[in-house]
């Protein structure tokens, strides 16, 4: 709970903003003293679906749109532009969109005896896994197409990000018809075999190749993501074991 500080003074609502703010009425309070509220109450919702339902009922003032609620809230036209569905507009809900520069990734434990280290064997395993995990498919299924597959740690809009062929991850992608194209899974399977695991088994012992994933995720939405990820590893005959941690 945040309450008004009786000793705060001297700040007013801005009179300038982004293009379109004035037309949207966001600058109507120009010059008025802040804050406008006496108290702000914040609560934490652990699950996305209950949070979304409470937002629709008016318990929350703002909400992001999860993949589970995307079709209910947003429609996409043939040009790729997004707009609220009629149901959302009737509730008086407004859609605010922006381009967010951020990066999320899954990392390898470089101390792991199987996929860690800088030996040619472990390096090829990491490369094979990177090719096999189809990030384009992940974005399409779980993020409703909102995002692009990373080519480096730098997202678009950050200084140093390179566009075009010179900016692609050539280990995972080829440059085809003016855009990056993920290498076929056959390349990943070949790398696994070159690492000493033909058909996903150690060529010396015959033991299956097992990779552990430590994750803090939970809930129904997370299970579907982990099931999808398990299938990605299975494409190159690698067994993925998910280990939940605190």
Describe these PLM feature segments.
Residues 19, 28-30, 41-112, 136, ...:
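Extracellular/periplasmic solute-recognition and catalytic clefts
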Residues 14-35, 76-86, 90, 119-120, ...:
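Surface-exposed intrinsically disordered loops and tails
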Residues 1-41, 49-50, 185-186, 190:
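Gly/Pro-rich hinge or "lid" segments in bacterial periplasmic/extracellular proteins
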Residues 15, 32-34, 42-51, 180-185, ...:
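Ligand/substrate-recognition segments at binding pockets and active sites
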Residues 115-116, 148-197, 215-225:
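Structural transition elements
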Residues 48-51, 66-70, 104, 121, ...:
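Stable alpha-helical elements in mature extracytoplasmic
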Residues 7, 56-60, 113, 125, ...:
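Sec-exported extracytoplasmic/periplasmic mature domains
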């Amino acid at each position: 709970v945040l309450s008004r500080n009786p000793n705060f003074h001297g700040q007013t609502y801005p009179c300038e903003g982004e293009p379109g703010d004035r037309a949207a009425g966001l600058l109507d309070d120009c010059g008025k003293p802040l804050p406008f509220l006496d108290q702000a109450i914040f609560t934490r919702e652990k699950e996305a679906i209950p949070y979304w339902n409470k937002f629709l009922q008016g318990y929350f003032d703002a909400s992001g749109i999860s993949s589970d609620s995307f079709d209910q809230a947003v429609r996409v036209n043939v040009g790729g532009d997004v707009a609220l569905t009629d149901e959302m507009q009737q509730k008086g809900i407004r859609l605010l969109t922006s381009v967010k520069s951020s990066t999320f990734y899954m990392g390898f434990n470089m101390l792991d005896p199987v996929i860690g280290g800088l030996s040619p064997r472990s390096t090829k395993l990491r490369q094979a896994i990177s090719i096999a995990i189809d990030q384009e498919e992940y974005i399409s299924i779980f993020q409703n197409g909102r995002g692009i597959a990373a080519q480096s740690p730098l997202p678009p809009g950050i200084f140093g990000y390179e566009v075009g062929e010179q900016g692609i991850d050539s280990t995972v992608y080829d440059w085809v018809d003016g855009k990056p194209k993920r290498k076929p899974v056959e390349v990943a399977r070949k790398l696994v075999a070159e690492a000493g695991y033909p058909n996903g088994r150690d060529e010396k012992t015959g033991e299956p190749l097992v990779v552990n994933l430590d994750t803090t995720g939970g809930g129904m939405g997370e299970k579907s993501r982990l099931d999808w990820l398990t299938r990605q590893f299975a494409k190159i005959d690698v067994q993925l074991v998910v280990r939940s941690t605190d």
